[in-house]
């Protein structure tokens, strides 16, 4: 699984870096030629795209290294650090200052048609990239690629806003460029805060989504020989899910048979969530307090 995961995530990061680099060169020319502050916003964002995607590529390769004596649970948390770094890279503050300045004192653009052409190219390329990233996220659940995808999704909205702003400026409403740049800056800042929150939650070992935990509960409680279960604990580090659970079994069940049942339950969980780290503890029903004989999500 890790080989497929690493290959897909690396390809997503390489594709994002290559596209951002190409668009950066085009946007530099377009900004120099038109003087559009909205294109300047897109240019700054492309610089952030390159830095973020390169960081993703390096961090993902590190996170896929096998566990060692100092990192016995592996290096998957590095992905959350990459997502947190992306949230730090993204900032709309400089755009606020530039857009407010242009809002107060609008500057006519030179040939908005060039800016429109460049923005259409950027929009098409970004939509293609986001579609590929969404496919990779669906296959891998990579937090780093998901953070990168959220960033490029904001780029799609940004490029759409730039198209509208350039079109309005073409017809003489020069303040539209600054207004849309201000809106872009606000949205970029919002995206940064959202990505930072998700990364911090992962670093704090947030439990798996409710739907996945419910699937684990369904697998366990429907298994023959299991009378009940409690203390389900879950988290995720990179591509690896960590699942711990206590099974309740009849007191007179031989230890060998209890181990066999627990092993079957573990294999069933692994079939549903390949590559997971599953720890199962067997408890005799008599040692479980009556109030504890129900499923508890921890």
Swiss-Prot record:
Q: Which InterPro entries match?
A: Cation_efflux, Cation_efflux_CTD, Cation_efflux_CTD_sf, Cation_efflux_FieF, Cation_efflux_TMD_sf, CDF_Transporter
**One Pfam family from the record:** ZT_dimer
Q: Which reaction does it catalyse?
A: Zn(2+)(in) + H(+)(out) = Zn(2+)(out) + H(+)(in); Cd(2+)(in) + H(+)(out) = Cd(2+)(out) + H(+)(in); Fe(2+)(in) + H(+)(out) = Fe(2+)(out) + H(+)(in)
Alphabetized GO MF terms: cadmium ion transmembrane transporter activity; ferrous iron transmembrane transporter activity; metal ion binding; zinc efflux antiporter activity
Provide this UniProt record's keywords sorted from A to Z: Cell inner membrane, Cell membrane, Ion transport, Iron, Iron transport, Membrane, Metal-binding, Transmembrane, Transmembrane helix, Transport, Zinc, Zinc transport
Cellular compartments annotated:
Cell inner membrane
Task: Give the transmembrane region(s).
Answer: 24-44, 80-100, 112-132, 154-174, 176-196
Report how it sits in the membrane. Answer: Multi-pass membrane protein
Q: Please give the chief subcellular localization of this protein.
A: membrane
Q: Which family does it belong to?
A: Belongs to the cation diffusion facilitator (CDF) transporter (TC 2.A.4) family. FieF subfamily.
Q: What is this protein called?
A: Cation-efflux pump FieF
The record lists the organism as: Salmonella typhi
């Amino acid at each position: 699984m890790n080989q497929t995961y690493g290959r897909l995530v690396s390809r997503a990061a390489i594709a994002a870096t290559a596209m951002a680099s190409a668009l950066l060169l085009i946007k530099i020319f377009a900004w120099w030629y038109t003087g559009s502050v909205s294109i300047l916003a897109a240019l700054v964002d492309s610089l952030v795209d390159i830095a973020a995607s390169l960081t993703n590529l390096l961090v993902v390769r590190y996170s896929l290294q096998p566990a060692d004596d100092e990192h016995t649970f592996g290096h998957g948390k590095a992905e959350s650090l990459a997502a947190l770094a992306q949230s730090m890279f993204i900032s709309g503050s400089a755009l606020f200052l530039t857009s407010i300045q242009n809002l107060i004192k609008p500057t006519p653009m030179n040939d908005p048609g060039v800016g429109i052409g460049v923005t259409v190219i950027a929009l098409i390329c970004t939509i293609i990239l986001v579609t590929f990233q969404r496919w990779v996220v669906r296959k891998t659940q990579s937090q780093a690629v998901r953070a990168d995808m959220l960033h490029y999704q904001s780029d799609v909205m940004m490029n759409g806003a730039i198209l509208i702003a350039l079109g309005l400026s073409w017809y003489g409403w020069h303040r539209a460029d600054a207004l849309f740049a201000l809106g872009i800056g606000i949205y970029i800042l919002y995206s940064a805060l959202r990505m930072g929150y998700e990364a911090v939650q992962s670093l704090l070992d947030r439990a798996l989504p409710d739907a996945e935990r419910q699937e684990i509960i369904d697998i366990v409680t429907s298994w023959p020989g299991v009378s009940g279960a409690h203390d389900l604990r879950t988290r995720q580090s990179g591509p690896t899910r960590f699942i711990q659970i206590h099974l309740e079994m009849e007191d007179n069940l031989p230890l060998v048979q209890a181990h066999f049942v627990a092993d079957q339950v573990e294999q069933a969980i692994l079939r549903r969530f390949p590559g997971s780290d599953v720890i199962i503890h067997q408890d005799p029903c008599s040692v479980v307090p009556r109030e504890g004989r129900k499923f508890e999500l921890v």
